Amino acid sequence: MAPRASALSRFPLAKSIAKCFPGHLKRRTNRKPEIVSEELCDHALQRLSPYLLRNRPLDILDLWPGAGLWSSKINRLLQPRRHVLVEPELQNFRPLLDPLAQSHPSYKLLSMDVFSIGDWKPVLTEHFPEQGPDNGDHTGVLPKNDTLLVLANLPATTSDKDHFTAGRWWQMFMETCMQQTGLHSYGAIRLLASLPSPESQAIIPRYVVDRRRVSLWTENVALHTFEVAAPQDEKFWVNHKGFNVAIDNAARVAERAAEKNISTPPGREFQPLLPAPESPDPGRKPVPYTPRIRTALHDRFCEDIQALDNMDKSTPGYAEAKKKRSRAQTRLNRDNRQAYFLQQMVDQSREIDAQYDALSRAAADPNTTSADFKPILDKISALRSSITDEGQENYHDHLKQFPHIHDSYRTSLRSNNNFDDALLAWDRRPFEPLLIHPEELYPQGIDRSIVYFEPNPNSPVIEKINSLDPSQRGDAFRLFETLSLSLGRGRESLSVAEVLQLIFPGRSTNDIVKSIPSLAEYAAKTPKPDFDSFPKTIHGGSTDPVTSFQENLDYDLSDVRVHILSTSTIWDICIEYQRSGVSVSSVQLNRLFGGTLTSYKTGVHREMVKKRLH
């Protein structure tokens, strides 16, 4: 394939941006590459128009507009009443933004440090006089305001010591959305952001182990969160998610797009997921071929294996090529063998989950006796033994992937093997993101993605929080903050049982599940020794025994990791903690979970914000 032209040679706007940053200032543009391709803007807005063309009149708050191409395209599509451009580096972008601001009376051009704004209410009052309490739609539990749209072209940090990343700004946006403060003072608003791709993948994680703080806060209030456009990535995350899950999920996304008649413009398609090659010689211990993501290492194996096919035995280097082929086949076979046993362990773990579901339903059957559980319990025991045996066939690095892939299956396909009810927004995406080519951003070489967020007026999390008196929500919020912080790097294996022991000392798991029935669906279950003496009733909001508390069962959450819990269940834990009357400060809670707090979380960013817990 011929190399694509550079941004400077293809797009006049790239040259104009370069002129805005002469000499030593050019390095500063690396913080925030600008969209220079009109076609990318047009394709992205074609995708977004059903979400953006909602109602008029509409106001737009446009943060870090930079070169202004994206801003001008959105203005033309939405025809806003007011479009306020806030560019912190206006001294550099003025040659591009001044003509834009003068091109239509809806524009107003300002310069201020966006990150330092602690209270947005005065900004709304001064520059958006039509915004007020009457703009809010209060028909849902979370009031929404479709008359204000925020565009944010978030910069990257300039230093590893800078804690205030684009993701942190996004997280604050979600927190204030929950609290109905700041930009959400008159109702929850929509956000269309461009930001560094790693930050986008933190907001919309591809696999459950990457589900951390910013994604949890987003899930609390999101109706829609999806990538509109993104650069090509190497898809290493597929190794953690599971190749089969990723393939099946992509197929379901294609079905969703077809159902909505959504097509992808030519050249905007992502490369499909390719499986690793099969070995031409399966070796002395053959196992069935197991699909996994193809990598550059597999390509090298193929080259070494195929190189010998074109060589005569008398050719110099034949002996060395033969050794390379043998090594490549051995490594390819070993890679397949590890993948095979890993998949076997995952499949058996999924079967154990299914057996626990069957056990729950049997325990609710009036005709079941304790003797009826023996086949189920025997099968669970046999499956566990098999997992232990197959675990011995795997290297340590592969074994570490086992709980990750099992959890990915649990969160993607737990509900009736249906991706539409999956935990992660990535699994529920309405379409694949459009492909951003490197030269469509200037400067090149820094990946950025475009993400759309829309709040959910019927958020189940907000409904749960509303069950508490406003004066009694502080401890619940503090625990949620601490739990979300604890899911940082190194704490992927944090179990629900560990958390419950820390915040509910002295309480049994059964007692806690009785108070929080939503935990039941995740737990391992066994019939109580005196099962026959207990009633078969189920407790909780569900009629399905799997998701309800049953007095005749014992529950175990020691093998359940926190990152697979829905935010709704996490908030059930937080609300039970609030009601328990045990009040601990954020710092004390954080110490319980072995974490550390940055100045960001100790409240520096909130000094000017009066927090309203909805």
What are these regions (language model features)?
Residues 172, 208-212, 501-505, 517-521, ...:
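Amphipathic alpha-helical scaffolding segments
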Residues 1-81, 474-478, 489-497, 509, ...:
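S-adenosyl-L-methionine
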Residues 612-614:
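A positional/structural detector of protein chain ends, strongest at the extreme C-terminus
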